[in-house]
Amino acid sequence: MKNIKIVVADWNKVSLGYETRERNENRSQEKGFEIGYSICACCGKPIENLETAKSLHLIEGGSYFTEYEGEINTCTGSDMGWWRVGPTCYKKFKKNEKEIELVNED
């Protein structure tokens, strides 16, 4: 068993509330943007410039974002994969990041 230290940010401090995000996602889809590709996972608004967009890994059943690229899927909780985020939400991530330790059961 090996412990992994990663930098994460709390989903609730980075994302908008569910209803606001869902409303923004619907508006973005009406404009032709795609969820998971060109819509921000945190706020649901369109990502205008995909070349400068960041991707964050959503882990622990959706409660944390991280930039860590290792074996997240072996930690406790569920791995929800990589999602694109816009520049404003990425700044919120960096502002709220903290280090946590996860247990890798391999």
Residue ranges and their predicted role:
Residues 2-17, 21-25, 33-78:
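Short recognition patches in nucleic-acid-associated and regulatory proteins
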Residues 69, 73-106:
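Short, compact, well-ordered microdomains
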Residues 9, 29, 104-105:
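Intrinsic disorder/low-complexity signal
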